[in-house]
Amino acid sequence: MDDFLSISLLSLAMLVGCYVAGIIPLAVNFSEERLKLVTVLGAGLLCGTALAVIVPEGVHALYEEVLEGKHHQASEAKQNVIASDKAAEISVVHEHEHSHDHTQLHAYIGVSLVLGFVFMLLVDQIGSSHVHSTDDPESARPSSSKITTTLGLVVHAAADGVALGAAASTSQTSVQLIVFVAIMLHKAPAAFGLVSFLMHAGLERNRIRKHLLVFALAAPAMSMLTYLGLSKSSKEALSEVNATGVAMLFSAGTFLYVATVHVLPEDTSTNQSGSSLSPRPLPSGKN
């Protein structure tokens, strides 16, 4: 029951913190120039948190259990070993197992990131092909970008929720707090970046609030579903394959796709078009 109470409180704090961080751009009236600056800031926060927070935290969560296990094995070996030759033999065995585990973890890192990126690529392609089948593809393209950006961040937040639910299933408070802090460190900038991007794209404020609410609800809902849906055997199996780290790296792949493929190119293209269009009316003599 303590685990359920803790995951409930963490989910509630995640929901409130994410929504409050995302509502800040809506609560302040920005001019057009300041809105561009806020949008660029949001895009920078998305890319920066993807590279500087999510990927390192996912790798740390992936390696943490193995490193703790090796530490316990080393302490037990020091207590139980009597002869020096036996100690040397056991250290060689531990070193071999350590290198074997590291090669497996390296594979987990790359595969999880690539799967997250490719998953969002497929979602993007399916969504864009569906939108381009409408009557006006030119006007449909910006709306597709808005929907894909929100959908990508919602998928990323859902993967974060799975990571938190898997961490809560381990019954280790320290692991839960580490994962929660890591998620909040990038969910708040992500909410800010999402809202600023949608404002810059011209979406109505009521619809922006709905997008923000869906994004804020995704991680808490998935964390509760993951925690409640896991059986005891499933929890043991997830702890063996480091599901927390794998889920965080998968979410990092989805986050990287949204930040680098949609938000950042959209901002740079609009800024370049605005700067290139401003001096052009001067040399032209046509009215």
Swiss-Prot record:
<keyword id="KW-0472">Membrane</keyword>
<keyword id="KW-0496">Mitochondrion</keyword>
<feature type="compositionally biased region" description="Low complexity">
    <location>
        <begin position="273"/>
        <end position="287"/>
    </location>
</feature>
<feature type="transmembrane region" description="Helical">
    <location>
        <begin position="107"/>
        <end position="127"/>
    </location>
</feature>
<dbReference type="GO" id="GO:0006882">
    <property type="term" value="P:intracellular zinc ion homeostasis"/>
</dbReference>
<dbReference type="GO" id="GO:0005886">
    <property type="term" value="C:plasma membrane"/>
</dbReference>
<feature type="region of interest" description="Disordered">
    <location>
        <begin position="268"/>
        <end position="287"/>
    </location>
</feature>
<comment type="similarity">
    <text>Belongs to the ZIP transporter (TC 2.A.5) family.</text>
</comment>
<keyword id="KW-0862">Zinc</keyword>
<comment type="function">
    <text>Transports zinc ions across cell and organelle membranes into the cytoplasm and regulates intracellular zinc homeostasis. Participates in the zinc ions efflux out of the secretory compartments. Regulates intracellular zinc level, resulting in the enhancement of AKT1 and MAPK3/MAPK1 (Erk1/2) phosphorylation in response to the BCR activation. Also functions as a membrane androgen receptor that mediates, through a G protein, the non-classical androgen signaling pathway, characterized by the activation of MAPK3/MAPK1 (Erk1/2) and transcription factors CREB1 or ATF1.</text>
</comment>
<keyword id="KW-0813">Transport</keyword>
<feature type="glycosylation site" description="N-linked (GlcNAc...) asparagine">
    <location>
        <position position="242"/>
    </location>
</feature>
<dbReference type="GO" id="GO:0005385">
    <property type="term" value="F:zinc ion transmembrane transporter activity"/>
</dbReference>
<keyword id="KW-0963">Cytoplasm</keyword>
<dbReference type="InterPro" id="IPR045891">
    <property type="entry name" value="ZIP9"/>
</dbReference>
<dbReference type="GO" id="GO:0005739">
    <property type="term" value="C:mitochondrion"/>
</dbReference>
<dbReference type="GO" id="GO:1905562">
    <property type="term" value="P:regulation of vascular endothelial cell proliferation"/>
</dbReference>
<keyword id="KW-0325">Glycoprotein</keyword>
<dbReference type="GO" id="GO:0031966">
    <property type="term" value="C:mitochondrial membrane"/>
</dbReference>
<keyword id="KW-0539">Nucleus</keyword>
<protein>
    <recommendedName>
        <fullName>Zinc transporter ZIP9</fullName>
    </recommendedName>
</protein>
<feature type="glycosylation site" description="N-linked (GlcNAc...) asparagine">
    <location>
        <position position="271"/>
    </location>
</feature>
<feature type="transmembrane region" description="Helical">
    <location>
        <begin position="147"/>
        <end position="167"/>
    </location>
</feature>
<dbReference type="GO" id="GO:0005802">
    <property type="term" value="C:trans-Golgi network"/>
</dbReference>
<feature type="transmembrane region" description="Helical">
    <location>
        <begin position="177"/>
        <end position="197"/>
    </location>
</feature>
<dbReference type="GO" id="GO:0071577">
    <property type="term" value="P:zinc ion transmembrane transport"/>
</dbReference>
<feature type="transmembrane region" description="Helical">
    <location>
        <begin position="245"/>
        <end position="265"/>
    </location>
</feature>
<dbReference type="InterPro" id="IPR003689">
    <property type="entry name" value="ZIP"/>
</dbReference>
<dbReference type="GO" id="GO:0022883">
    <property type="term" value="F:zinc efflux transmembrane transporter activity"/>
</dbReference>
<dbReference type="GO" id="GO:0048471">
    <property type="term" value="C:perinuclear region of cytoplasm"/>
</dbReference>
<feature type="transmembrane region" description="Helical">
    <location>
        <begin position="35"/>
        <end position="55"/>
    </location>
</feature>
<keyword id="KW-0864">Zinc transport</keyword>
<feature type="glycosylation site" description="N-linked (GlcNAc...) asparagine">
    <location>
        <position position="29"/>
    </location>
</feature>
<keyword id="KW-1133">Transmembrane helix</keyword>
<dbReference type="GO" id="GO:0070830">
    <property type="term" value="P:bicellular tight junction assembly"/>
</dbReference>
<dbReference type="GO" id="GO:2000654">
    <property type="term" value="P:regulation of cellular response to testosterone stimulus"/>
</dbReference>
<keyword id="KW-0333">Golgi apparatus</keyword>
<keyword id="KW-0406">Ion transport</keyword>
<keyword id="KW-0812">Transmembrane</keyword>
<feature type="transmembrane region" description="Helical">
    <location>
        <begin position="211"/>
        <end position="231"/>
    </location>
</feature>
<dbReference type="GO" id="GO:0005634">
    <property type="term" value="C:nucleus"/>
</dbReference>
<dbReference type="Pfam" id="PF02535">
    <property type="entry name" value="Zip"/>
</dbReference>
